[in-house]
Amino acid sequence: MAAAAKEITSLEKNGTWIEVDISNAKTRILPGTWVFRIKRTPDGEIAKYKARYCVRGDLEEGEPETFAPVVAWSSVRLFLILSLTLNWDTCSIDFSSAFVQAMLQDPVWIHMPRGFTSGTANGSKRCLRLVKSLYGLSVAPRLWFEHVLKAFTSQGFKQSQNDPCFLYKSTIMVLLYVDDVGIAYANQSDLDTLLSNLTKQGLEFTKEQGTFTDFLGIKFVKDAVNNTVTLTQKGLIQKIIEATGMRDCNPNWTPAIQQTLGIDPDGEAMNEEWSYPSIVGMLLYLSTNTRPDISFAVSQVARFNHNPKRSHASAIKTIVRYLHRTHDKGMIVRLTGDLSIDCYVDADFAGLHGRDPDYAPTSAKSRTGYIITLGGCPILWKSQLQTEISLSTLEAEYSALSASMRIMLPLKSMLTEVVAALKLPSQFKSTIRCRVFEDNNGALLLATKQRITNRTKYFLVKWHFFWSHVESGEVNVLKIDTTEQWADYLTKGLNREVFERIRKLVQGW
């Protein structure tokens, strides 16, 4: 109740609404609802209890524009890598009651919050007319984004053409994720000026103590001596272990067995107390942010949310046993050279053949895996089934190559854009290049020589869009030995020796 009272006091102090007679409402009066939650640190400790009073936006009339972007995780890692390269300091700020800081463009009427009485004594029926945005309104995220974006752009910040939530000037970078903001800066005076101007514009925020250590549930630990940043999600891993009841399990050395996981149509139904989709959701957030080592295993189990069998639940337990052993691990961001973009790409041709029933389209599908690095640090990775059926190993490899290029080229564009604006040493500006490492000779030949035959013409027309970048020398496609293929652990289950060798290369441990 204390958190709820604090919320109402904050909203009234902010001038969020005006109390009016109910007869003044020009549109439907919307009900509200309370949302209570416990905010935790990345390590799972309780940070604070929060209460939000929200509008039932699902009952709104009309179809207003609602889209509001958030920063991509590849941009977060780009931010970290560039801050290490430049040896810039970092910090984060959290805007207080963010959505209610934006002015509402069209009036909205809501009922009085349950448990709180009117400030008048005449006994008339009262409601609230919103002056500012409020949580739950469909337009609230968009209004807040436009409000906070204007606060930064008015100070000379530019939006990246590739990520609207990545802002920069010559000596400072900013990440926007709703009300959480990450900042990297060259000088303390740059930061002081930025924060002072935000305050002058009426924005309320709290600056986190120290460096950029906690962002969206991920803990960042900087080692100034070795110039590294370690990303971990110990709190989420512990939550997964607790949710599956595997606190006392026997740990595994790898997250997946070497046999591919299939549909198992005749298998017994899952018989566990925990929610399969809920655990998969947490595993997906973990695998896409700090743990590429479980990406293949998680991609496999994520196929069966609609009808999980006992074998699929067992596969999740295998992942959890591995996480139990490596609960304090994550990914070490360590610069190994210049700011080159490298892409390791691999494919597993028809890996589900014999595992999924012949009538299932997935039984003939191949798997794509790729890891894109910047300065030797992983910035983006993927393990997924290909959307179309490849007719040969060559076609599967080439499809994977094309998919990775579609992701890598925009990253290169963003890097070039940001580096041009930042005050980077000349040696970094002159060494930006793109390299793609492929271990299939046929795919390598097609990508570099463009030898079109009757057998390859039909898929080259569709997937060979990147040829101009290869021909101009902007992108180099190079041969790599299979034993050095970083993406190998994204396409199949591996034995412990091979798996740990690749994990060391990619994640640093």
Q: Predicted regions: what is each one?
A:
Residues A4, L11, W34, G44, ...:
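Mobile genetic element proteins and their domesticated derivatives, centered on retroelements
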Residues K39, F99-M112, Y135-V139, K169-E204, ...:
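Catalytic palm subdomain of template-directed nucleic-acid polymerases
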Residues P42-I46, L86, T90-C91, T117-G123, ...:
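Short helix-interrupting loop/turn segments at helix-coil junctions
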Residues F67-V70, S74-V76, I172-M173, N227, ...:
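Divalent metal-binding acidic/histidine catalytic loops
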Residues S92-S97, C127-L137, Q161-Y185, T211-V221, ...:
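Catalytic palm active-site di-aspartate
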Residues Q155-N162, G182-I237, E242-T244, H324-T326, ...:
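Polymerase palm active-site segment centered on the conserved acidic dipeptide of motif C
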